[in-house]
UniProtKB/Swiss-Prot annotation:
Domain of life per record: Bacteria
Membrane topology, record value: Peripheral membrane protein
Organism of origin: Lactococcus lactis subsp. lactis (strain IL1403)
InterPro entries: Membr_insert_effic_factor_YidD (IPR002696)
Function: Could be involved in insertion of integral membrane proteins into the membrane.
GO cellular component, one term: plasma membrane
Compartments reported by the entry: Cell membrane
Record keywords, A-Z: Cell membrane, Membrane
Family: Belongs to the UPF0161 family.
HAMAP family: UPF0161_YidD
Protein encoded by which gene: yrcB
Protein name: Putative membrane protein insertion efficiency factor
Length: 88
C-alpha cells in the first residue's frame, strides 16, 4: 500500500503539478511532505498527515519550514531545521 501511495504522488508530481502554477507556501512542498510522511509513518498515518498539510496550505497561512515530525501529529511542525555552522 505504501508503494502505491508513493507512486500516486510521484505521478501527480510528474504529470499534473507541472501544469499548475506553483502554490505551495511551505518547504518541503506538500507533495514531498506527503511522500516523506508515508515513508516515515506508514500509509494510514502518512496519508492523514499529508492531507492535513494540504488543508493548511492556503493563501492565509504563514509560510515557512514544515518538516515531517518524528512522532505522528496532524499539526504544523514549527521547529526550524538545524543550520550548518560556518567553518570560517
Amino acid at each position: 500500500m505504501k508503494k502505491v501511495l508513493v507512486k500516486a504522488v510521484h505521478g501527480y508530481q510528474r504529470w499534473i503539478s507541472p501544469a499548475l502554477p506553483p502554490a505551495c507556501r511551505y518547504y518541503p512542498t506538500c507533495s514531498n511532505y506527503m511522500v516523506q510522511a508515508i515513508e516515515k509513518h506508514g500509509p494510514a498515518k502518512g496519508l492523514a498527515m499529508g492531507t492535513a498539510r494540504i488543508l493548511r496550505c492556503h493563501p492565509f497561512c504563514q509560510p515557512g519550514y514544515d518538516l515531517v515530525p518524528d512522532h505522528f501529529s496532524l499539526r504544523r511542525n514549527w521547529a526550524e531545521p538545524e543550520k550548518e555552522e560556518d567553518s570560517n
